[in-house]
């Protein structure tokens, strides 16, 4: 959430940010509404002061035996007017809060200004795609032919955009989760967490999935609970309403969880394979940082995601998202994209974002500087990594002419010595 004081004191800064993000929100309209809120509060306070004076006068008249009827009539009118204004004030305050909650985060000055993904900027690349002497097959064809991915049974069990993983595929998913968590906890100093897969409305609001993106979420019909779209939600909200010590920053958490997404608005996109599913497994990284250190932490987190792909021998590139393509809560985002030979392009496999104090302000997560007032922490999140898209990349990049798939060497110990998946 944007700082209201920033809106009031530097409206031109917010106006430019909203324009760069193509949000369509009018700062002038917001300031007019907020002005009405402040005017109402002033008017109500003035009327309450008059009511207090009138009450004192009524008491004095009654003590002296004089007629207080005219003042009682005035007192009644004042009370009625205050009640009317209280109702209007409550509504205007709600409108101000709702409009404030609908504003995206302010982009960092290093973020390129652009309208959409076509204006993102590549900032790094690792590895060279293999030169194949045969036409590469898509991962879903490979996985199905090798007996590991079953889309037909998943469709009968549930519906479209689901998959059943069997045998080596289920084992590979488990191996990836263990490999990712081992790297994060043993080498990158993350604390592993096993959080609930359902969260309440307050938690979803804290990380800014609500109220804007409710249609993208799965909600339990009889409860005000939501299935998590990412472990970012429970991990970030671990410290909701808390004050951390400055000496405890940065804090880093990771978790492997299923993620549930309705994929509203994705009709026709990635209808085949395991790139875009309603349910998938992902290891998430979340960091709480000092405001002066958060962009250093973003570079660190990006490095953690890229290192996993390097160890898996998967060619990839890093891009900085432009203002028009960033997520709602992000001040700066790096997307890491892995090479998929069958699509002859790079596809997103990790997104690492610095949300500055945007989520912390909504979830009320603060820290206590030495000798100073409490301040909001900066929150960061990143994929480290999703198993589905990683399996897709392994299948496509490791495919051989005979139909087999060579596994990355780093996974062999996690697969009990299995080095390749052979045709049945």
Swiss-Prot record:
Associated pathway: Aminoacyl-tRNA biosynthesis; selenocysteinyl-tRNA(Sec) biosynthesis; L-seryl-tRNA(Sec) from L-serine and tRNA(Sec): step 1/1
GO BP, one annotated term: selenocysteine biosynthetic process
Binding site for ATP: 261-263, 348-351
Matches recorded under InterPro entries: aa-tRNA-synt_IIb, aa-tRNA-synth_II, aa-tRNA-synth_II/BPL/LPL, Ser-tRNA-ligase_type_1, Ser-tRNA-synth_1_N, SerRS_1_N_sf, SerRS_core, tRNA-bd_arm
Localization annotation: Cytoplasm
Annotated catalysed reactions: tRNA(Ser) + L-serine + ATP = L-seryl-tRNA(Ser) + AMP + diphosphate + H(+); tRNA(Sec) + L-serine + ATP = L-seryl-tRNA(Sec) + AMP + diphosphate + H(+)
GO CC terms, sorted: cytoplasm
Residues at which L-serine binds: 230-232, 284, 383
UniProt keyword list: Aminoacyl-tRNA synthetase, ATP-binding, Cytoplasm, Ligase, Nucleotide-binding, Protein biosynthesis
Pfam family, one: tRNA-synt_2b
EC number of this enzyme: 6.1.1.11
SUPFAM superfamilies: Class II aaRS and biotin synthetases (SSF55681), tRNA-binding arm (SSF46589)
Bilayer-spanning residue ranges: none
GO MF term (any one): serine-tRNA ligase activity
Enzyme class at the top of the EC tree: ligase
Assembly and interaction partners: Homodimer. The tRNA molecule binds across the dimer.
Function: Catalyzes the attachment of serine to tRNA(Ser). Is also able to aminoacylate tRNA(Sec) with serine, to form the misacylated tRNA L-seryl-tRNA(Sec), which will be further converted into selenocysteinyl-tRNA(Sec).
Family statement drawn from the similarity comment of this UniProt entry: Belongs to the class-II aminoacyl-tRNA synthetase family. Type-1 seryl-tRNA synthetase subfamily.
Domain comment quoted from the record: Consists of two distinct domains, a catalytic core and a N-terminal extension that is involved in tRNA binding.
Protein name from the UniProt record: Serine--tRNA ligase
Organism the protein comes from: Desulfovibrio desulfuricans (strain ATCC 27774 / DSM 6949 / MB)
Gene it is expressed from: serS
């Amino acid at each position: 959430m944007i700082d209201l004081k920033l809106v009031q004191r530097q409206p031109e800064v917010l106006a430019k940010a909203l324009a760069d993000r193509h949000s369509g929100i009018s700062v002038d309209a917001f300031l007019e509404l907020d002005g009405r809120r402040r005017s109402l509060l002033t008017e109500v306070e003035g009327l309450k002061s008059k009511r207090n004076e009138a009450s004192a006068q009524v008491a004095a008249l009654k003590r002296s035996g004089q007629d207080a009827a005219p003042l009682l009539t005035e007192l009644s009118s004042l009370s009625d007017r205050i009640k009317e204004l209280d109702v209007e004030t409550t509504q205007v305050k709600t409108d101000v809060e709702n409009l404030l909650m609908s504003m995206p985060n302010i982009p960092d000055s290093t973020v390129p200004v652009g309208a959409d993904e076509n204006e993102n900027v590549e900032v790094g690349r690792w590895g060279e795609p293999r030169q194949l002497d045969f036409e590469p097959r898509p991962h879903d064809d490979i996985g199905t032919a090798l007996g590991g991915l079953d889309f037909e049974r998943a469709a009968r069990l549930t519906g479209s955009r689901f998959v059943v993983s069997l045998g080596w595929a289920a084992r590979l998913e488990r191996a990836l989760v263990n490999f990712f968590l081992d790297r994060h906890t043993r080498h990158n100093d993350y604390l592993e967490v096993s959080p609930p897969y359902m969260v309440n409305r307050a938690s979803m609001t804290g990380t800014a999935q609500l109220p804007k993106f409710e249609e993208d979420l799965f909600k339990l019909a009889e409860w005000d609970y939501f299935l998590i779209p990412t472990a970012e939600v429970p991990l970030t909200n671990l410290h909701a309403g808390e004050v951390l010590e400055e000496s405890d920053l940065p804090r880093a958490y990771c978790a492997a969880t299923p993620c549930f997404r309705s994929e509203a608005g994705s009709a026709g996109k990635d209808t085949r394979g395991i790139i875009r599913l309603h349910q998938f497994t992902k290891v998430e990284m979340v960091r709480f940082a000092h405001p002066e250190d958060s962009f250093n932490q973003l570079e660190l987190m990006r490095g953690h995601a890229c290192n996993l792909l390097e160890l898996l021998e998967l060619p990839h590139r890093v891009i900085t998202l432009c203002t028009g393509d960033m997520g709602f809560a992000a001040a700066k985002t790096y997307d890491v994209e892995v090479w998929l030979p069958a699509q002859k392009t790079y596809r997103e496999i990790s997104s690492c974002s610095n949300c500055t104090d945007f989520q912390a302000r909504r979830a009320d997560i603060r820290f206590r500087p030495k000798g100073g007032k409490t301040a909001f922490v900066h929150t960061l999140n990143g994929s480290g990594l999703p198993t589905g898209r990683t399996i897709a990349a392994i299948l496509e990049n490791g495919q051989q002419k005979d139909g087999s798939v060579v596994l990355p060497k780093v996974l062999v110990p996690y697969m009990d010595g299995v080095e390749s998946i052979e045709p049945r």
